[in-house]
Amino acid sequence: MALNLQDKQAIVAEVSEVAKGAL
């Protein structure tokens, strides 16, 4: 299942937020 660019950006944003919270 291919993700479009907006989906990828949204996932990256979520992962970044989680990573910041984990630090």
From Swiss-Prot:
Q: Does the keyword rRNA-binding apply?
A: yes
* Alphabetized UniProt keyword annotations: Ribonucleoprotein, Ribosomal protein, RNA-binding, rRNA-binding
One GO CC annotation, please? ribosome
Extract one GO molecular function annotation from the record.
rRNA binding
Q: RNA-binding: present as a keyword of the record? A: yes
Superkingdom of origin: Bacteria
What does the protein in this record do? Forms part of the ribosomal stalk, playing a central role in the interaction of the ribosome with GTP-bound translation factors.
State how it assembles.
Part of the ribosomal stalk of the 50S ribosomal subunit. The N-terminus interacts with L11 and the large rRNA to form the base of the stalk. The C-terminus forms an elongated spine to which L12 dimers bind in a sequential fashion forming a multimeric L10(L12)X complex.
Family recorded in the similarity comment: Belongs to the universal ribosomal protein uL10 family.
Q: This chain belongs to which protein, by name?
A: Large ribosomal subunit protein uL10
What are the leading ranks of the lineage? Bacteria, Pseudomonadati, Pseudomonadota, Gammaproteobacteria, Enterobacterales
